[in-house]
Curated annotation (Swiss-Prot):
Its cofactor is FAD. The keyword Oxidoreductase applies. It catalyses: 2 reduced [2Fe-2S]-[ferredoxin] + NADP(+) + H(+) = 2 oxidized [2Fe-2S]-[ferredoxin] + NADPH; reduced [flavodoxin] + NADP(+) = oxidized [flavodoxin] + NADPH + 2 H(+). Gene3D superfamilies: Nucleotide-binding domain of ferredoxin-NADP reductase (FNR) module, Translation factors. The gene is fpr. Keywords: Cytoplasm, FAD, Flavoprotein, NADP, Nucleotide-binding, Oxidoreductase. This is Flavodoxin/ferredoxin--NADP reductase. It holds the Pfam family NAD_binding_1. It is found in: Cytoplasm. Transports electrons between flavodoxin or ferredoxin and NADPH.
Length: 257
């Protein structure tokens, strides 16, 4: 059983017109960094006719916070005409919603085999699981290098860059961070898209490390097109294989939407 339980909204942080974070308080079961949950509201929050049976509108969202943090943080993109995301965007401090008691998913460090360099690629809100993992500081000393890469459309969408910089300092040289923007040029970020920046080797040259099957593991999270294209490139160009629970590989993936 995995029942819905109540969550109380402590804060809604609206980063842009389309990006926001919910800070929640809820008595959920312990979860692992990198896992996701489900949030829901009843359809009665919208003006439906009385003859329509009311049900929960639910969506899956990843945690940004470390499991040891008592406040839950969820990073969300507001979808045009999206039923739930627009309702969540308009919540206020003190409002309530539903959250699943138990969390889901295997996008966790326990599923990652030992390696020298762990690459974490994210687009958009896919940065969330990595923030959770890196803030927890567990099962992470076995990696010599951790590379965190966040790709967005515009520079102002790098909403968790201050946290990334704090983590960079706290890891004392183990963690490297890089940002990418695809729809404008900014001297603080690489310009382009992840698959192309791997194909032309610009990204690896900037980092100073090369992805290879002998000492690297790659985590991909976010836009399904990025995940697919990056996976296919690594599979073909670097002879890397998908990581499975029954058979360890070199690439661990999680699609958003």
């Amino acid at each position: 059983m995995n029942p819905w339980i109540n969550a109380n909204v402590l804060k809604v942080h609206k980063w842009t017109q389309n990006l926001f974070s919910l800070i929640l308080n809820a008595e959920i079961a312990p979860f692992q960094a990198g896992q996701f949950t489900k949030l829901a509201l009843n359809e009665e929050n919208i003006n439906f006719s009385n003859n329509v049976k009311k049900k929960k509108i639910q969506r899956a969202y990843s945690f940004v916070n470390a499991p040891s943090n008592k406040n839950l943080e969820i990073y969300i993109v507001r979808i045009l005409n999206g039923k739930l995301s627009n309702l969540l965007y308009n919540l206020k401090s003190g409002d309530n919603l539903f959250i699943k008691e138990k969390s889901f998913g295997f996008f966790t460090l326990d599923e990652i085999p030992n390696c020298k360099t762990l690459w974490m690629f994210a687009t958009g809100t896919g940065i969330g699981p990595y923030c959770s993992i890196l803030q927890e500081y567990k099962n992470i000393n076995r990696f010599k290098n951790i590379i965190l890469i966040h790709a967005v459309r515009y520079q102002n969408e790098l909403t968790y860059l201050p946290l990334m910089k704090q983590l960079y300092k706290s890891y004392n040289g183990k963690l490297k961070i890089e940002t990418i923007v695809s729809r404008e040029k900014n001297h603080n970020s690489l310009y382009g898209r992840i698959p192309l920046l791997l194909q032309n080797q610009i990204l690896e040259k900037k980092i100073g490390l090369k992805i290879n099957r002998n000492d690297s593991h790659v985590m991909l999270c976010g836009n399904p097109a990025m995940v697919k294209d990056t996976y296919l490139f690594l599979q073909k160009d670097r002879c890397m294989q998908k990581n499975l629970r029954r058979k360890h590989g070199h690439i661990t993936m999680e699609n958003y939407w």
